[in-house]
Design a protein with these regions (language model features):
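C-terminal helix-rich "cap/oligomerization" subdomain common to oxidoreductases
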Residues: 16, 38-43, 76, 257-293
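Hydrophobic residues in well-ordered beta-strands that form the structural core
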Residues: 64, 89-91, 221
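Predominantly a Rossmann-like dinucleotide-binding segment in NAD(P)-dependent oxidoreductases
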Residues: 98-168
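Active-site loop of classical SDR/Rossmann-like NAD(P)-dependent oxidoreductases
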Residues: 6, 244-256, 272
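Contiguous beta-strand/loop segments that form the cofactor/metal-binding neighborhood of enzyme cores
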Residues: 156-227, 256-264
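NAD(P)-binding Rossmann-fold cofactor-contacting core
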Residues: 1-17
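Rossmann-fold dehydrogenase core element
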Residues: 76-94, 114-117
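Beta-loop-alpha module in the N-terminal Rossmann-like domain of NAD(P)-dependent dehydrogenases
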Residues: 7, 18-81
Length: 293
């Protein structure tokens, strides 16, 4: 229906791209429009809280891009407002709703007790060449709560949480730039009898993969969870390959889910998802604290 940007020129481009009816360069004006009942926030990370709060206080439901907010205090405040106003508040994290995630969970049951998981999600940023020339954009400065862990690692954390739960001990070591964020790093999440390590980087190329090692076999997702097309798994003494291409686009499943529970007015289901998002945000906080970012 409507597109907002601080620049009306950019707002008009968004309007044309997505076939919206209106464009706004004032968030307040957009939020006063009675035809708008949902707002999707995809602004820099540090702006999520302020903009989401404005939307909720204006009576609008919110879908906010990952990472949800900078800390759990911000999330708790917005959950309180959303409950008081009976509004929906969702974190847009596509991997949680992909059919392939359920396929992966089922396969894990076939490889016995899992003891180790290794995940690599690295992606040479389209903005890194400019960064090397001294042009520092949002993703490479703490001013916008950015960095590799927040931008790419958040996918790793949600996946780890979905597969294994919250964890007990957390550590992270990052390559911290002069602007206070990690441009690459590796983390470790420990459980009672399981160790999960992950890498996320925005300054280098790599094969992306997920390797889950069990006592009776292993699983290798050939790529990151949202883009991989096949899974290799060893079980019962045999090496197998499984096609995991989804029928629909990456974002179809999460927005179809949001639509369904909104139409059912299922605020309890929304609360369940908010609890999951808070758990992952707590993990992110602990990892950042371990390396002082």
């Amino acid at each position: 229906y409507g597109a907002y940007s601080r620049s009306i020129k950019k707002a008009n481009k968004l309007k044309e791209k997505f076939g919206a009816e209106k464009s706004f360069d004032s968030l307040e004006k957009m939020l006063s429009d009675p035809e708008i009942n949902f707002v999707y926030i995809a602004s820099p990370n540090s702006l999520h809280y302020k903009q989401a709060r404005m939307c909720l206080e204006a009576g609008k439901n919110v879908i906010c891009e990952k990472p949800f907010f900078t800390n759990t205090k911000e999330l708790d405040e917005l959950i309180k407002i959303s409950k008081e106003k009976n509004l929906f508040l969702f974190e847009a994290i596509s991997i949680k709703y992909l059919p392939r995630l359920e396929v992966l969970k089922d396969l894990i049951k076939k490889i016995g007790k899992v003891s180790t998981c290794i995940i690599n999600y690295s992606q040479y940023s389209s903005r890194f060449d400019k960064y090397k020339e001294g042009i520092v954009e949002n993703i490479f400065t703490s001013k916008f709560s950015a960095g590799a862990l927040a931008d790419l690692g958040i996918y790793n954390l949600h996946l780890i949480y979905e597969l294994f739960g919250k964890g007990d001990d957390f550590s992270y070591s990052g390559n911290i730039n002069d602007y206070g964020v990690d441009i690459a790093g590796s983390g470790l999440i420990s459980y009672k009898d399981l160790t999960v390590s992950f890498t996320n980087a925005k300054d280098c190329q790599s094969e992306n993969f997920i390797l889950i090692q069990g006592q009776e076999g292993y699983i290798k997702v050939c790529g990151n969870i949202q883009e991989a097309e096949k899974i290799e798994y060893f079980s019962d003494g045999k090496l197998n390959y499984l096609d995991i291409k989804d029928e629909n686009s990456l974002y179809f499943y999460e927005f179809d889910y949001f639509r369904e529970i909104y139409e059912k007015n299922d605020l309890k289901e929304c609360e369940k998802r908010l609890k999951e998002s808070k758990d992952v945000l707590e993990i992110l906080e602990k990892l950042k604290k371990s390396t002082d970012i």
